[in-house]
Amino acid sequence: MKESQSLTNNLLMEVEVLSNRLRNIKQCYKSTENKALKGRLFSENKNLFKRVSEIYKIAELLKKNNPENINFSNLLVEITKRTLNENKFESNLFFL
């Protein structure tokens, strides 16, 4: 396995974990009344969103360096893009 493939696979796994955590945070945020917990959840959500954004930038670079149309880099770009869009769309939950 090439080094970039290994990196891409690791990033795919990380994005999957981050995406699940972001969903769990939103669910917790909606169901709790504790202001301190809501503050921590909001902060963690922001940090995770930043990390997914960083991974998206890396994925774009990997995609540029790989001439193939169908590959893991393209999959990584698509998954991170969907995670970012899902988080942007649902970010309104924090301002209810």
Go through the PLM ranges and name each one:
Residues 1-19:
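Short, charge/polar-rich alpha-helical segments
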Residues 9, 35-50, 70-77:
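Short, charged, amphipathic alpha-helical segments
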Residues 11, 18-26, 32, 48, ...:
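Non-transmembrane amphipathic alpha-helical segments
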Residues 12, 16-17, 27, 46, ...:
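Intrinsic disorder/low-complexity segments in short proteins, especially the signal peptide
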Residues 18-20, 37, 48, 60, ...:
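Intrinsically disordered, low-complexity regions enriched in serine, threonine, proline
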Residues 46-67, 85-93:
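Amphipathic alpha-helical coiled-coil segments
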Residues 70-96:
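Amphipathic alpha-helical binding modules
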